[in-house]
Amino acid sequence: MRKLFFCGVLALAVAFALPVVAAPKAPADGLKMEATKQPVVFNHSTHKSVKCGDCHHPVNGKEDYRKCGTAGCHDSMDKKDKSAKGYYHVMHDKNTKFKSCVGCHVEVAGADAAKKKDLTGCKKSKCHE
């Protein structure tokens, strides 16, 4: 009976630990995105409460996380490009299938004016330098 109990506890421990071990390692902080007029320094550690899939989307049905501006993804740097290829659009549009940076920040800031300025402002915000 003890062996069976021990095996059950061990199986549960492995089952709960597996997703943590299998999760992709986030890139180092200080990722500088310079495709916009005002560069953004992105820190994954600041966003650790957000699931990878909340920002990154599957590529060919796989969770193949890549940089947003990777060739074939959001590689159109034309600010007026409102398609899914438009880099500016996917970062700033509040109504995309996957949450944009600004869309998520608006939600997080809520009605707090100071947070709104910090998280959604173009100049002197916590995003743009």
Curated annotation (Swiss-Prot):
Post-translation changes: Binds 4 heme c groups per subunit.
Binding site for heme c 2: H57, C68, C73, H74
GO MF annotation list: electron transfer activity; heme binding; metal ion binding
Residues that, per the record, bind heme c 4: H92, C122, C127, H128
Keywords, sorted A to Z: Electron transport, Heme, Iron, Metal-binding, Periplasm, Signal, Sulfate respiration, Transport
One Pfam family in the UniProt entry: Cytochrom_CIII
Superkingdom in the source lineage: Bacteria
UniProt-recorded name of the protein: Cytochrome c3
Origin organism lineage: Bacteria, Pseudomonadati, Thermodesulfobacteriota, Desulfovibrionia, Desulfovibrionales
